[in-house]
Amino acid sequence: MGGTFDPIHHGHLVAASEVADLFDLDEVVFVPTGQPWQKHDRRVTAPEDRYLMTVIATASNPRFSVSRVDIDRGGPTYTKDTLRDLHELNPDADLYFITGADALGSILSWQNWEEMFSIARFVGVSRPGYELDGKHISAALRELPADALSLVEVPALAISSSDCRKRAVEARPIWYLVPDGVVQYVTKRRLYLPEPTPELRTPE
């Protein structure tokens, strides 16, 4: 399951559990992005903090694990590299790449997207009521197997990382939106605090 996880929340965990059940997956590997190329216009929490929050959030589920492949690779994170690395580490595994359905809307702009479908099946998870306009995607993928791309609706995805960050900036509680250990980590590390306003000095 790929994502920025900034921070990871219960929606991510429920989605992973639901997909694991529906597709009978042995394991769900969470892969925090290193440097998300599509989010260069906003501040992203340090990779190590996002990795540790993901470890904390997934620790109690023996079916979940966390990979550092994107964080340790360096440079901008592209899904094609993520899948190549995971395939090299697990050459005999049937890979499913779980991501937000909204991200799949732009999949044809991803680097080497054709190659990615030869490595893994894609599962897009969405909040209730979200509709993916997939006509252009379907046209491009018509030569691929019918199960190359699946969509799964997950009610808990009404929670979003951006809302969690906004609440933290405003000193509002994020309890029960993210796992307890993540709340404690965010507090201890003082993540998502407002950026200090530069002090302006009047010339004397």
UniProtKB/Swiss-Prot annotation:
Cited CDD domains: NMNAT
Spell out the reaction equation it catalyses.
nicotinate beta-D-ribonucleotide + ATP + H(+) = deamido-NAD(+) + diphosphate
InterPro entries, per the entry = Cyt_trans-like, NadD/NMNAT, Rossmann-like_a/b/a_fold
> What Pfam families does the annotation carry?
CTP_transf_like
Might you give the EC number(s) for this enzyme? 2.7.7.18
Going by the UniProt record, its keywords in alphabetical order are:
ATP-binding, NAD, Nucleotide-binding, Nucleotidyltransferase, Pyridine nucleotide biosynthesis, Transferase
Q: Which GO terms describe its molecular function?
A: ATP binding; nicotinate-nucleotide adenylyltransferase activity
Please provide the Gene Ontology terms (biological process) for this protein: NAD biosynthetic process
Q: In which pathway does it act?
A: Cofactor biosynthesis; NAD(+) biosynthesis; deamido-NAD(+) from nicotinate D-ribonucleotide: step 1/1
Q: Read off the Gene3D superfamilies from this record.
A: HUPs (3.40.50.620)
Q: Which domain of life is it from?
A: Bacteria
Q: Does the keyword Nucleus apply?
A: no
Membership in a protein family: Belongs to the NadD family.
Chain's role: Catalyzes the reversible adenylation of nicotinate mononucleotide (NaMN) to nicotinic acid adenine dinucleotide (NaAD).
Q: What is this protein called?
A: Probable nicotinate-nucleotide adenylyltransferase
Q: Which organism is it from?
A: Mycobacterium sp. (strain KMS)
* Gene name for this UniProt entry: nadD
